[in-house]
Each structure stands twice: as structure tokens, then as C-alpha cells.
Regions:
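Glycine- and other small-residue-rich loops at beta-strand/loop junctions that grip anionic moieties
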Residues: 15, 45, 133-134, 159-160, ...
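Active-site/ligand-binding-proximal alpha/beta "capping" segment
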Residues: 204-258
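Structured adenosyl-cofactor binding patch, chiefly the S-adenosyl-L-methionine
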Residues: 107-109, 147-151, 165-178, 240-279
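Short, aromatic/basic amphipathic alpha-helical patches
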Residues: 74-84, 241-242
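RNA substrate-binding interface of SAM-dependent RNA methyltransferases
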Residues: 51, 87, 115-116, 120-211
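A glycine-rich helix N-cap at a beta->alpha junction
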Residues: 82-100, 184-187
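Boundary-proximal intrinsically disordered activation/regulatory segments immediately upstream
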Residues: 1-75, 162-163
Length: 279
């Protein structure tokens, strides 16, 4: 018997059959229509990798099952006591047959979605908020969450056309921060921007327009205020109606004929400038 079979309070169950129904919540993670993290299907939240699983355990999303190799179980042994969920231990080959691809990170956790707060709730007490419109790429979305966590952004607000922050790829790219940084979805867009303004936020809209204020100028002017950084989709950027509702249009000075940066990179620069000023 391995000492990993008797971690206090952890229900370790060995699984050798990839068709075992206990593993159904991890099945076909790459399929278009059967993947368990589709909001229209099971709507599960899937954490992938030791660090992301650890962040799920620290979040409001409570896993109901974990699947991983013996090696990853060993790495998580100090995190799992008290977790009321079985750990299905399997070989890497069995895991690959279940999920549909070879999983280098060696461990998954599945949790059910929980009710989401409203915009007013997540911005209450916040100094810096990221507001996203049309950010429909999961990797960009995940990167923005990681940047937000690392650079002191208090919350994220989703406008229209954004990808699902709880999609497995978004959670993975965010390194689990999509599970920890508070977020809310606007129910009336872009009218909900007025809610932010009524709560004292200065709305800074990122745009490549040469007529906009520079990022350094805009952030310095708003140093003592609550700030909402508005970023739009790759390519089209923020919609005209959203730009009209902003307080200041903000650009990042560019060179060599480059008109703009990737949305996650642009957001990171804005977050950094805000943090650099100690706001």
C-alpha cells in the first residue's frame, strides 16, 4: 500500500478502466458538443494542473471530483485534507483516453458553477476595474485575468460579446485567477457603464486613435479616482457607443507603424501604469 492511499480525509479511488462512469465529468474535454465545461451542457468548471487546482480549492468553486496521476496526488497531498471529493487515481494513459488528449499537467478537478454576483456587488469597494467588450478569445480572456490578478485590478466586468471566463482554456491560461478575481456580467450594455460612473468611476477607454490622451497622461490625471479600464475586441476595438460613454479615450504610443497591441498586452500595460502610480 502506498502512503498516498491513506492521506487523512482524502477518498483516493483507483480507476483502471477509461469507460468507468465515475470519470464522466472529465470525458471528451476537446469535443465541440460533448465537453463538460459547455454552459449549455453540464456547465462544469474544470481546473487543469496542480497550481490551477490549488487555486480552485481556494475559490468559491468547490470541486466534487478530482482525477489525476499518483505523482500529482503526491504534489497535492497537503491541499486535499478536508476536501469532500473523491480523488480518482489513474495512469496517464487512462487519463488520455478519458479526456481525449495527453494531459501533461496530470490532474483535473471538476466543480459546479455557482450564482454570479451583479455588477454593483463586484465593484463595491473596488478602486480599479477592468471592463471588457467583445473579448471573445478564451486565451486573451484568461491572460487578462492573470494580468488583473498580478497587477492589482479588483474586479472584471463583462460587456457584450465576451467569451466564457469559466471555459477550461480560459481558466488554464489565467493560471486559475479566473476563479479568484471577482467578475460580473453586465445585463444592460453599454448602459451599465452609467452604474460605474454613478459609483464614482472614471471610465478610461483604450483606443488606437491618435487623438486620444496617452496612457501615462490619463492615468496620472485619474490617480486619485476610482478607475474603470475599458478594452475591446481584437481588431474592431470598443464600439462607438461605448467610446461615447467613456470619460477619456486613452492610447498607448506606438512605433514602427504598429497601430495597436494584443488586447491582453494592452490591458496589462494599463493595469501596470495604474499600479505604478500607487492607485
Amino acid at each position: 500500500m502506498s502512503d498516498l492511499d491513506c492521506i487523512d480525509g482524502v477518498d483516493v479511488q483507483d480507476v483502471g478502466d477509461p469507460d468507468d462512469p465515475r470519470l464522466d465529468d472529465f470525458r471528451d474535454l476537446n469535443s465541440v458538443d460533448r465537453r463538460p465545461d459547455l454552459p449549455t451542457g453540464k456547465g462544469l468548471v474544470i481546473a487543469e494542473g496542480v497550481l490551477v487546482v490549488q487555486r480552485m480549492l481556494a475559490s468559491r468553486f468547490t470541486p466534487h471530483a478530482l482525477l489525476g496521476t499518483d505523482r500529482r496526488l503526491a504534489e497535492l497531498r497537503d491541499d486535499l485534507p478536508g476536501v469532500a471529493a473523491p480523488f480518482y487515481r489513474a495512469s496517464a494513459d487512462v487519463m488520455a483516453q478519458v479526456v481525449g488528449f495527453h494531459l501533461n499537467r496530470g490532474v483535473l478537478a471538476a466543480a459546479r458553477r455557482v450564482p454570479e454576483p451583479g455588477v454593483a456587488q463586484v465593484v463595491d469597494g473596488a478602486r480599479t476595474v477592468a471592463v471588457l467588450e467583445g473579448v471573445n478569445d478564451h486565451e486573451n480572456l484568461g491572460s487578462i485575468f492573470r494580468n488583473a490578478a498580478g497587477l492589482g485590478v479588483d474586479a472584471v466586468v463583462f460587456g457584450s460579446g465576451c467569451a466564457d471566463p469559466l471555459y477550461r482554456r480560459a481558466v488554464r491560461v489565467s493560471m486559475g485567477h479566473a476563479l479568484l478575481v471577482p467578475y460580473a456580467r453586465a445585463t444592460s450594455w453599454p448602459a451599465d457603464l452609467m452604474l460605474l460612473r454613478e459609483n464614482g468611476f472614471r471610465l478610461l477607454a483604450m483606443t488606437p486613435s491618435s487623438e486620444a490622451s496617452t496612457l501615462a497622461e490619463a492615468m496620472a490625471a485619474a490617480r486619485d479616482e476610482r478607475v474603470a479600464v475599458l478594452v475591446g475586441a481584437e481588431g474592431p476595438g470598443l464600439k462607438s457607443a461605448t467610446l461615447r460613454l467613456s470619460d477619456v479615450r486613452v492610447r498607448i504610443p506606438m512605433s514602427r507603424g504598429t497601430d495597436s497591441l494584443n488586447v491582453a498586452t494592452a490591458a496589462a500595460l494599463a493595469f501596470y501604469e495604474r499600479a505604478r502610480l500607487g492607485s
